[in-house]
Design a protein with these regions (language model features):
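N-terminal and secondary-structure boundary signal
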Residues: 2-339
C-alpha cells in the first residue's frame, strides 16, 4: 500500500457529489482554527487518517456467526439442475434455514454485484440464487431482508443488469444502495486492513448476515468466491489493495463473521474473470455449497468448481494459517446430496 502523504488541505464542499467523490473528498463540518495547526475534529480519508488531526478509533463489526454445532454439518454440497431446488437441498442438508434464521430476524444478504453484467455471464450473483435464499429466509420467519453491495460500476445499473433489483421488487426485499452517508470508519487489526471506510448502513439493522456469491475466476487473486465477496463492503480507493490482494482477502475472514455463506456454482465463470464477457467462459457445474466456514467453502469451490490446484490460492493458505478457517474441508463435518 502506498505510503505517500495526503494533502492536508480541506476539500471544497459541493452541493452535490457522487458517492465515490464523497468517500475520497469527505469534508469536515465545524470550524478549523486557521493557521494554528489545531483542529476540533480529525479528517477521515478512506485509506488513512490525515496527519495533524486527532486519530479516532473506528467501529468494529459484531460477530454474526452462530455457535458451532457438534452434530450438524458445517458445510453442505448439493448437486442439481434447478437453482431453487439445489439451494434448498444444500440448506436442508445443513440443517435447514431455521437453524440460522429465527422469527423476527432482520437478515442482510450480501450478493456480488460488482459489475453491470447479465446473469448469463456468471460475473454476479444470479437472481435465481437470490430468490431461492430470500424465500428460505422469509419462510424461516425473518421480518425483513436487506440486499446490499457497493459495486464498482453504477449501483443502480449493476443491480438492474444483474436482475437482482427485479427480484427485490418482486419479493418486497429492501434494496439498499450505497449513499454518501452509508459509510463509517472501520478499524481492524488485519494484515493489511487497519482503518478504512466501510458500507455500514445495512449492518445497523441486521441481526443475521448471509454472504451469497458466485464462483468465478479472478485475474488478480485467481478466484472470487465467498471470502472475496466482502471486498464489496469497502469504500474509498479500495483498488490500492490490489498490490496486496491475497492479504486483504484473508483479512476479510477476520473482518466478517457471517451467519452463513452460500457459494453458487450452478454456472461458473472459468476464465476472464472477474468481469467475464463471453458465454464460452462459463461452465455449468450444477452445484451449490453452503457453510459456516468461508475458508472451507472456498477451498471446495476452488478445487471442485474452478477445478484448480489449491496450492496456488495464497489467500486460502493465509486465512488457514491465521486460524480463520480450515482449508482442509474434508476434515469438517460435511454432507453431500443430490437435489
Amino acid at each position: 500500500m502506498s505510503t505517500s502523504k495526503p494533502d492536508n488541505a480541506l476539500p471544497r464542499l459541493e452541493a452535490s457529489v457522487s458517492r465515490r467523490e464523497f468517500l475520497v473528498r469527505l469534508g469536515v463540518t465545524g470550524a478549523l482554527i486557521a493557521g494554528s495547526g489545531l483542529a476540533t475534529r480529525r479528517l477521515w480519508q478512506p485509506d488513512h487518517f490525515v496527519p495533524g488531526f486527532q486519530e479516532e478509533k473506528g467501529l468494529q463489526l459484531k460477530n454474526y456467526a452462530l455457535e458451532a454445532s457438534k452434530v450438524l454439518p458445517s458445510m453442505a454440497i448439493a448437486h442439481g439442475l434447478d437453482h431453487e431446488k439445489t439451494v434448498r437441498a444444500a440448506m436442508a442438508a445443513l440443517g435447514g434455514m431455521g437453524r440460522f434464521i429465527q422469527k423476527g430476524d432482520v437478515v442482510m444478504i450480501k450478493p456480488n454485484v460488482a459489475f453491470d453484467r447479465p446473469p448469463a455471464l456468471a460475473a454476479t450473483t444470479h437472481p435465481d440464487a437470490l430468490r431461492a435464499v430470500a424465500k428460505l429466509v422469509l419462510e424461516a420467519g425473518a421480518s425483513k431482508v436487506i440486499i446490499a453491495d457497493n459495486p464498482i460500476n453504477s449501483p443502480t445499473g449493476c443491480f438492474f443488469k444483474s436482475g437482482l433489483s427485479a427480484v427485490a421488487s418482486e419479493m418486497n426485499l429492501e434494496l439498499m444502495y450505497p449513499e454518501s452517508n452509508s459509510f463509517s470508519p472501520l478499524s481492524l487489526n488485519g494484515e493489511i486492513l487497519k482503518n478504512w471506510t466501510f458500507f455500514h448502513q445495512p449492518f445497523k439493522q441486521a441481526t443475521k448476515v448471509i454472504g451469497l456469491s458466485p464462483c468465478k475466476d479472478h485475474n488478480l487473486c485467481h478466484s472470487s468466491m465467498t471470502m472475496k465477496n466482502w471486498y464489496g463492503l469497502l469504500g474509498g480507493r479500495r483498488n490500492q489493495f490490489h498490490q496486496h490482494i491475497h492479504s486483504i482477502v484473508s483479512d476479510f475472514a477476520l473482518m466478517m463473521k457471517p451467519t452463513l455463506v452460500i457459494l453458487d456454482g450452478m454456472n461458473v465463470l472459468m476464465s476472464n474473470g472477474p468481469t467475464g464477457g463471453r458465454l464460452s467462459d462459463v461452465k455449468p457445474m450444477n452445484t451449490v455449497v453452503a457453510g459456516t466456514d468461508m475458508v472451507a467453502v472456498d477451498a471446495y469451490g476452488y478445487t471442485h468448481l474452478l477445478e484448480r490446484d489449491l496450492a496456488e490460492l495464497t489467500y486460502i493458505h493465509k486465512a488457514h494459517d491465521r486460524g480463520l478457517g480450515n482449508k482442509n474441508w474434508k476434515d469438517a463435518l460435511y454432507k453431500e446430496v443430490q437435489a
